[in-house]
Amino acid sequence: MIEESVKPLNWTPAPGIGYTVVRRPDGGMHYTFTDVSHETLVHWREFALEHLLQADRLTRNLYDLRAVKEITQEAIEYGIEVNSDPSARNIRLAVVVASDEIREAIEKIPALTAPGGVEFRIFTDINEAEAWLDRPLTLMV
């Protein structure tokens, strides 16, 4: 069996942004956010939408928001925009949070997005998030 090649990440860190991203072993992306400042959100939005333009397979992504202390309305609006992209239907997304306040804010994104977007779940334990992401992707369809 020929192993499918992993797509390049095409991400470059920039001064002043509050997130990093690395390619996951399964080909998805692992984002780690430390803040959701305007600069961070603009950079993330551009990167995320660019990747969605090239989405050609089912993907598992992990967003680690445990260091984020507050989710702004702007962050929710950007999340809704990206989650509404038609290519988002190919993504299984686990979000890891550290507080009920962050969980409640993040829950607004799928609640305000038209059906058919990302398969989305929120966790407080990163190992539980990984176990959920590891389920076969064929369960999405």
Predicted ranges, named:
Residues 2-141:
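Amphipathic, Lys/Arg-enriched alpha-helical "gate/interface" segment within cytosolic domains
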